[in-house]
Amino acid sequence: MLFEHLQYYGVSRKIIEAMNKVDRKLFVPSELQESAYLDIPLPIGYGQTISAPHMVGMMCEYLELKDGDRVLEIGTGSGYNAAVMSLLVGESGWIYTIERIPELVQEAQKRINLLGINNITIIVGDGKEGLEEYAPFDKITVTCYAKHIPKKLIEQLKDNGIMVIPVGNEYVQILKLIRKSGEKIIEEDLTHVRFVPMQ
């Protein structure tokens, strides 16, 4: 199994199995195929990256994904993270993912089609705005850092929902876990991370 070492990051067997089912090699540029299974982020063009496998696993773990979850992802990138999450929410769940770069959306859509995954919707748009027409969401995951948590994302999170988002600047970023309980927003700092900026 490719990602067995992720158990040392606290990633569960269920998530490791989902990650092993989605071939990361399909999601990286041809010139980086030899590095596809290394536990490092890789450039995918347009100033964007595919996250290191341990970060994908940890973020899925923090989200507590379950069958039937409706998930909003900000930053489709290569589509790898959405593909993994699509397995974790099952056929009754759905992944809505937003990407601002049309070329990345086209490439991600091709990969998703190739894999025969049919519970993902990829949309070109501004992540800060979320997707009001499909809200509310059980879970929201953000794969780019924000200087502040966008208010619209909190508004689109279901009561008792979970959001995982990197917050900070180009030098220091903290991965935060946000829980929404009625009018109350509970923030927890998880770990230091390094992501590309939300535009």
UniProtKB/Swiss-Prot annotation:
Q: Look up the signal peptide feature and give its range.
A: none
Under the heading Gene3D superfamilies, the entry gives: Vaccinia Virus protein VP39
Keywords, alphabetical: Cytoplasm, Methyltransferase, S-adenosyl-L-methionine, Transferase
Subcellular location, record wording: Cytoplasm
Major localisation: cytoplasm
Q: Which Pfam families match?
A: PCMT
Q: Which SUPFAM superfamilies match?
A: S-adenosyl-L-methionine-dependent methyltransferases
Q: What EC number(s) does the entry state?
A: 2.1.1.77
- The coiled-coil segments of this chain are none
Q: Which reaction does it catalyse?
A: [protein]-L-isoaspartate + S-adenosyl-L-methionine = [protein]-L-isoaspartate alpha-methyl ester + S-adenosyl-L-homocysteine
Q: Where is the active site?
A: S51
Cellular component terms per the entry's GO annotation: cytoplasm
Q: Which InterPro entries match?
A: PCMT (IPR000682), SAM-dependent_MTases_sf (IPR029063)
Gene Ontology molecular function, alphabetical: protein-L-isoaspartate (D-aspartate) O-methyltransferase activity
- One record GO biological process: protein repair
Instruction: Return the broad EC class.
Output: transferase
Function (record text): Catalyzes the methyl esterification of L-isoaspartyl residues in peptides and proteins that result from spontaneous decomposition of normal L-aspartyl and L-asparaginyl residues. It plays a role in the repair and/or degradation of damaged proteins.
The family annotation for this protein states: Belongs to the methyltransferase superfamily. L-isoaspartyl/D-aspartyl protein methyltransferase family.
Query: What PANTHER family does UniProt report for this protein, alphabetically?
Result: PROTEIN-L-ISOASPARTATE O-METHYLTRANSFERASE (PTHR11579), PROTEIN-L-ISOASPARTATE(D-ASPARTATE) O-METHYLTRANSFERASE (PTHR11579:SF0)
Protein name (database record): Protein-L-isoaspartate O-methyltransferase
Q: Which organism is it from?
A: Fervidobacterium nodosum (strain ATCC 35602 / DSM 5306 / Rt17-B1)
Instruction: Give the taxonomic lineage as stored in the record.
Output: Bacteria, Thermotogati, Thermotogota, Thermotogae, Thermotogales
